Amino acid sequence: MSQMENSTKKVESVADVEVVATENAKVEQKPTSPADAIQLKVNANSTIKNLKTLVSIVKLTESGAHIGLNPKKWNPKMANYIHAKRSNNHVIDILKTILFLDRAYKFLQEVAQNGGTVMFVGTRGRVVKELIKAEAERTNSFYVTQRWLGGTLTNFANISRSLKKFNSNLALLESEEINKYSKKEQIAINKETAKLEKFYGGIKTMKQRPDVLILVDPVNDVNAIKEARKLNIPVIALANTNADPQLIDYIIPVNNYSVKSITLILGVLADAIAELRGEPTKIVGRPDSEIVLPETKSSWRQNNYDPSKRGYNPKYVNHKSTFNKFNNKKPAEATSQAKTNEKIVIKAETN
């Protein structure tokens, strides 16, 4: 498989896209308005002609794909993929997101056309794990959603033995042979199978190493990248501004902390395989009105502070009994109780 070309070379995408990137690119430091996120002027370090996208810029910005991390967390090697700095976040150059997404899309179709296999990797967060599993199952690919086990690629012989044991247990549990075992032995087999299912459920049919890895977070799952690089297995990764692009063969600069943008990008990558097989696509070729992104709840808590309430503490908002016990006292009663406590203290000191 071909490695990603150096940023100083001309790169061609699926849709006759040409990019000439300079290695000494500087990040624009002036703040940008929300309109800039949609209009997205082409950076000085890139020239894009006749761009045809797999997903619209409007949909990408709606998903928050252009929002990077705080500049304190950035990796300077990602400078070529950053459009500007706004407020407390970097802004990812979304035109480059589209460009490199096209490139990864074309590469995946070549892999699928040659009968290659794909492994999706995403071990961060319940929602990401569910997305990884759904897209992998849609394309009959392998997936890893639990902690990356060392040697999954480099020590494949040992992994194969574990897979053989796992599949043997599954076959045993589905057959009548299991009735020949005692109740205690059946419980032990079930426990062992459940443990194997947790780590090997997404790769139980894998007979050989995958031909390409797709990672949601190359920082969190860097061990998977290290193993893939040792074996020259190409890596496609959704890279935020804290990633190291030199470890990734097919980088997709995008916000990989947004469930919406992850859903969008993973959907496009899975569509590359589905489209080649003649199966219906989920994102590619569909109008924006038909692309439904998941709804996410705001992480901000409601401010319930009311200065008119004496002794109010938001900590006790949901604990009415404690809150009322403290606040229902009249000022006179509170003052009287304070004086009584003071007399007790003075009396104790005199004694």
From Swiss-Prot:
Listed GO CC annotations: cytosolic small ribosomal subunit
Keywords for this protein: Ribonucleoprotein, Ribosomal protein
Family: Belongs to the universal ribosomal protein uS2 family.
InterPro entries (UniProt xref): Ribosomal_uS2, Ribosomal_uS2_bac/mit/plastid, Ribosomal_uS2_CS, Ribosomal_uS2_flav_dom_sf
Stretches the record annotates as Disordered: 302-351
Single annotated GO MF: structural constituent of ribosome
Keyword field contains Ribosomal protein: yes
Underlying gene: rpsB
UniProt-listed NCBIfam families: rpsB_bact
Pfam families in the record: Ribosomal_S2
GO process annotations (BP): translation
KW Ribonucleoprotein (keyword) present: yes
Segments of skewed composition (Basic and acidic residues): 340-351
Protein's name according to its UniProt entry: Small ribosomal subunit protein uS2
